[in-house]
């Protein structure tokens, strides 16, 4: 039962995170690990890009990147 609850919470967090503009301060998101810039730019929509472990608004949305 606890495992089921954890899964539901995880899916909820993922779904909320994929909403447009779901960033900590509107510019940089730090609670997700981004992949390399080339992978991010290839796989993601053009609104965020990876900068280290941060998602920075500009080129692609790192939520769609392979981790």
Curated annotation (Swiss-Prot):
Q: Which domain of life is it from?
A: Eukaryota
Gene Ontology molecular function: any one: potassium channel regulator activity
Q: What is its main location?
A: secreted
Could you confirm whether the keyword Disulfide bond appears in this record?
Answer: yes
The entry's cellular-component GO terms read: extracellular region
Q: Where is the signal peptide?
A: 1-24
Which UniProt keyword terms apply here?
Disulfide bond, Ion channel impairing toxin, Neurotoxin, Potassium channel impairing toxin, Secreted, Signal, Toxin
Hey, which family's this protein in? Belongs to the short scorpion toxin superfamily. Potassium channel inhibitor family. Alpha-KTx 06 subfamily.
Function statement: Inhibits voltage-gated potassium channels.
Q: What is this protein called?
A: Potassium channel toxin alpha-KTx 6.16
């Amino acid at each position: 039962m606890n495992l089921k609850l954890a899964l539901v919470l995880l899916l909820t967090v993922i779904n909320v995170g994929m909403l447009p503009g779901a960033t900590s301060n509107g510019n940089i998101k730090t609670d997700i690990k981004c992949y390399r810039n080339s992978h991010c730019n290839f796989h993601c929509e053009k609104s965020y890009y990876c900068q280290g472990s941060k998602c920075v608004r500009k080129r692609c949305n790192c939520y769609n990147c392979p981790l």
